[in-house]
């Protein structure tokens, strides 16, 4: 899987939100942006809207405008129990995890 693959990004987002939950911290908005994953804004919005629709994430405000979608309240994002279950039980997310680990081995500073 490529680093910009849907399941790789979903894994990273859910893993980050789960770590924030366990630490009792609010997520930093800078980690919940398209630029954090080097992807196009439309692709990022698709991913986040999918996570919200599937009820894996909640707390993000979605505002539909004539120019598109605005995502707000990013520091209020939280992974749901359904999202935690998906994180640990989805085989495609396991492949994404392996992809990220392989990249870290090749590029130590990632």
Where would I find each of the regions flagged by the language model?
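Short amphipathic alpha-helical interface segments
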Residues: 6-36
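Generic structural signal for hydrophobic core residues of well-folded globular domains
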Residues: 17-21, 51, 87-90
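Short linear capping/connector segments at secondary-structure termini
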Residues: 29-33, 62-67
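Short amphipathic alpha-helical interaction segments
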Residues: 38-60, 74
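Short, amphipathic alpha-helical interaction segments positioned at domain boundaries
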Residues: 67-102
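Short acidic DE-rich linear segments
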Residues: 103-110
